[in-house]
Swiss-Prot record:
UniProt cross-references to InterPro entries, sorted A to Z: T-conotoxin
UniProt note on tissues of expression: Expressed by the venom duct.
Source organism: Conus pennaceus
Listed name of the protein: Conotoxin PnMRCL-022
Signal peptide: 1-22
Length: 60
């Protein structure tokens, strides 16, 4: 019987906690894809440049 008040208090505390949003907050992936495309383009340009002309690799 001594545990009953503690149990009731715990139930009240659990019920009064703020609810948590189940969906994670994520940023829009458009900027991530833009950055990935830009980086891929730079690496691709460097690779093609270095195949034909070595001096231009420093400038890209």
């Amino acid at each position: 019987m001594r545990c009953l008040p503690v149990f009731v208090i715990l139930l009240l505390l659990i019920a009064s906690t703020p609810s948590v949003n189940a969906r994670p907050k994520t940023k829009d992936l458009a900027s991530f894809h833009d950055n990935a495309k830009r980086t891929q383009h730079i690496f691709w340009s460097k690779r093609n440049c270095c195949i034909y002309e070595n001096w231009c690799c420093e400038w890209i």
